[in-house]
Amino acid sequence: MNNHSETESSGHNSVHGNNDNIPGWNEELELAFSAYKGLYLAGRISSRHKTVCEVLVPGAVVQAGISGALQRIGKQPVVGDFVVLLDQPETGSRMVVNILPRRTCLSRGAAGDGGGEQLIAANLDTIFIVTSVGKDLNLRRLERYLAIVYSSGASPVILLNKIDLADDPARLVEKIRDVTGDVPVIPLSALSKTGLDALGPYLNPGETVALVGSSGVGKSTLINAFLGETVQKTADIRKDDEKGRHTTTVRQMFLLPNGAVLIDNPGIREIQLGDSAEGLEKAFSEIVDAARNCKFKDCTHRNEPGCAVLQAVRDGIIPEERLESYHRLTDELSFQSKKAEIGLKRLEKERYREMAVNIKKYRKFTGKP
C-alpha cells in the first residue's frame, strides 16, 4: 500500500494503536471489534497475495496469513475488508482470524463450470467505472458493469478517459447517458489531468473508491495523477486492436493525502453477472418501470399480449437494443443461477462420497461392521 505509514519489513514490533487511524474506521466497526481483547489487532486489507495479505493497522502496514478456520468455512478476506488479526509475538507472525461486517461488497460471477461468486473488493463508497475513447467504449459492457456495481451497494460513477483523442467528447458523453440514466458521467484525460477536479466530491477523507475497467483504459494513470507520483506502472495500447496490456496484476489500496482511499483493480476481461438480479433491475430501471403496466405479472417482455415494455419499444421510448441487452443479461443470470445450483449439488455429492469412504475406513480400522 502506498501511504504515509511505516511499512514493517522485518522483526516484530508492537503496532497496537488508535483504530481511528485506519482509513474508513467507524463506530460500528469499533463496536464489532470490542469483543476482541489482548493480542488481537484491527486492520484493513490493503493487498492480497494468495495466502498472504498486507494489512493496514494503526501506524504500519504488516503481513499476515489467513487462518485455517476461515479458509475451511470459505471466508476469504479481500482488499478493503476490515479484519481481526491475532498478534503472535512469540512466533513473530500475525494471522487474519475474522472479517468484520462488510457495508458493501463488489463481486462478479466466478469463471468456470461451478458458478458462484468471485469477490473483488469490500467496503466501497463509490466505484469509478473507467472506459475510454476508442474501441473500449462499449455500451453493452457498461450495462454489465452497472449491474454488478449496483448489486454491490456502492454508487457508480462513469469516467470517460482520453477525451483529448475524441473529436466530439460531448457526443460520446450523451451516448453513454442514453443507457446509464442518472449515473454521473465525467469526461477527463488522466494524462493531461483535464477534468480531474470533477472527481473531488467523490474523494472525501475516510471514503473508499474502487476503479474498475478493461486493461488500457487508464486506471493506473489515474492513480498516479491522484497521488502526484508514479506508483503504478502504465503501458501503451497495442496499435493493432487498441487493447491494453495488463500492468496492474493485484488489487491494491492507495491512501490519498487527504485521507481518501483508492483501490486499483487489474483489468477485467470478462464480466459475468453472478448474483446481480437487484443490480440488473437498477441498470435497466426504465424497463422495470414500464413492466409495472404489463397485463401479466410474469410477463417476459418477448411476445406476450398487453406487454407495456414491448409497447414502449414500438413507441420509441425504450431503444430496441436496450431490451435485447436486458433479455441477454436476464437469460445469463438465470443460467448462472442454475450453474451455481448444479455446482452445490455436485459439491454435496462429493462430500457424502468422502464421508462414506471415511466411515468405511473407520469400520475397517475398528473391526466394526
UniProtKB/Swiss-Prot annotation:
Family matches, as CDD domains: YjeQ_EngC (cd01854)
Compartments where located: Cytoplasm
GO cellular component: cytoplasm
Similarity-based family: Belongs to the TRAFAC class YlqF/YawG GTPase family. RsgA subfamily.
Binding site residues for Zn(2+): C294, C299, H301, C307
Keywords for this protein: Cytoplasm, GTP-binding, Hydrolase, Metal-binding, Nucleotide-binding, Ribosome biogenesis, RNA-binding, rRNA-binding, Zinc
Gene Ontology process terms (BP): ribosomal small subunit biogenesis
Cofactor: Zn(2+)
Function: One of several proteins that assist in the late maturation steps of the functional core of the 30S ribosomal subunit. Helps release RbfA from mature subunits. May play a role in the assembly of ribosomal proteins into the subunit. Circularly permuted GTPase that catalyzes slow GTP hydrolysis, GTPase activity is stimulated by the 30S ribosomal subunit.
Cofactor details (free text): Binds 1 zinc ion per subunit.
UniProt EC number: 3.6.1.-
The protein's name: Small ribosomal subunit biogenesis GTPase RsgA
One Pfam assignment: RsgA_GTPase
Lineage: Archaea, Methanobacteriati, Methanobacteriota, Stenosarchaea group, Methanomicrobia
Native species: Methanosarcina acetivorans (strain ATCC 35395 / DSM 2834 / JCM 12185 / C2A)
PROSITE patterns found in the cross-reference section: ENGC_GTPASE (PS50936), G_CP (PS51721)
Residues where GTP binds: N161, K162, I163, D164, G213, S214, S215, G216, V217, G218, K219, S220, T221
Subunit-level organization: Monomer. Associates with 30S ribosomal subunit, binds 16S rRNA.
GO molecular function terms noted in the UniProt entry: GTP binding; GTPase activity; metal ion binding; rRNA binding
Superkingdom field: Archaea
Predominant subcellular localization, coarse grouping: cytoplasm
Residue ranges annotated for the CP-type G domain, each copy included: 116-271
